[in-house]
Design a protein with these regions (language model features):
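Jelly-roll (double-stranded beta-helix
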Residues: 1-382
């Protein structure tokens, strides 16, 4: 994150103790060895107390051998509720750097999770929840983005109607660098501000601290820690690396005299992707503007769109929860009649999540089961 944060009790100086009879156990939680962003956490007990460890194969990730490159439409309302937030993830797209899918938990988690290799970005399409982490807890609501740093031990409790879009990234998930001034502060004119982010509140009592197992995700398998002490035992912490949430209702979409390209809607970025949000907003104000997207060829990216709510004028056959993938090399844009129908429109109420992947995205077997097979033909139909 771009600003310093502190919770609870920490020593006056790093790597020191306040009382010889009650030494807090310091943990450096940091990326890129000792050179990246980090926080210092102070435990009452040793965070290394693992009495046994075992391996479980990860069955959720199911790559397909489909080798057809074309535009796709997936109908995620066809996905049934499944498992919990650990074992019930339904992966849909992947490449060497990211994984994308939907979670519709049918049951509560019964252990903690820690992703050893990937950062996680969640979007709450439906429902609400509570994220409990080693840093504290964050209440979650419909429309929330949730960032969970790689290596974070967490427990996610969700409502029965929760539907969550998730992205796992092997590259760091950042705020776009162009949104920051040279001091690291968010600039004026960005779609959000520092006070829009919700940060963890450290526990006085640890309500989620009832399990001693941690599923450590290594992408294709889990290592399961069986601990002999409770894990949420932090007296305090400070630093620049921690989970956070931000709701799309707090964001201010950028508009212009003429149609604005997708990058103006960017919210998060990484070496191999960017994530943006299309939000309700006034359309362009040139008297002859065409208010929907022009035709374009994604020469260097695959364009993923998750449609959350509202009317998507440029697309036919789309419903809340639909996903489209527009691949590089094949032109896409408004479907027949959409340009003409858009003339005179003054605003849009659409809400959608966009992921631009810089490496081609592949489909899973789960994705093929919910695909609208005729979507590629939709541009040839009047």
């Amino acid at each position: 994150m771009v600003f310093y944060y502190k919770q609870g009790k920490v020593p006056e100086f790093r790597h020191t103790f306040d009382s010889k009879d009650n030494i807090l156990k310091e943990e450096l939680f940091g990326e890129e060895s000792f050179d990246g962003l980090y926080s210092l956490l102070y435990h009452f007990g040793e965070p290394t107390r693992v009495k046994d460890i075992s391996r479980e194969e990860k069955k959720e990730f199911d790559p397909s051998d489909d080798n057809i490159t074309k535009h796709r439409h997936l109908v995620t309302s066809k996905l049934e509720r499944k498992g919990n937030f650990i074992n019930g993830r339904q992966y849909l797209f992947w490449n060497n750097r990211i994984r994308i899918g939907i979670s519709k938990p049918a049951e509560k988690m019964s252990a903690y999770m820690r992703n050893a290799l990937a950062e996680e970005l969640l979007f709450f399409h439906r429902g609400k929840g509570k994220l409990s982490t080693i840093f504290g807890w964050i209440s979650l609501f419909e429309g929330d983005y949730v960032y969970i740093p790689k290596g974070t031990t967490f427990f996610l409790d969700t409502s029965e109607d929760a539907e969550i879009l998730f992205m796992e990234s092997f590259d760091r998930i950042d705020l776009p660098s162009r949104y920051l001034n040279r001091y690291g502060q968010l600039r004026e004119g960005t779609p959000y501000y520092t006070r829009d982010f919700r940060l963890p509140i450290l526990y006085e009592i640890t309500p989620a601290n009832r399990y001693k197992k941690v599923y450590v995700d290594y992408d294709t398998y889990y290592m399961v820690e069986d601990r002999d002490t409770l894990i949420f035992d932090v007296a305090g912490w400070d630093g620049y690396l921690y989970p956070y949430a931000i709701n799309i209702e707090r964001m201010a979409p950028i508009v212009g005299k003429l149609h604005q390209p997708p990058p103006v809607h960017e919210n998060f970025s990484g070496k191999s992707f960017m994530v943006g949000t299309f939000l309700p907003r006034p359309f362009d104000f040139h008297p002859r503007s065409i208010p929907i997207s022009y035709y374009h060829n994604n020469i260097d990216t695959d364009e993923f769109l998750f449609y959350s709510s509202g009317n998507f004028m440029s697309r036919k056959g789309i419903e809340p929860g639909s996903i489209t993938l527009h691949v590089r090399g094949i032109i896409h844009g408004p479907q027949p009649g959409a340009v003409e129908a858009s003339i005179g429109a003054k605003s849009t109420d659409e809400k959608a999540v966009m992921i631009e992947a810089y490496e081609p995205l592949q489909l899973t077997k789960t994705a093929l089961k919910i695909e609208d097979k005729d979507y590629m033909k939709s541009w040839s139909k009047e």
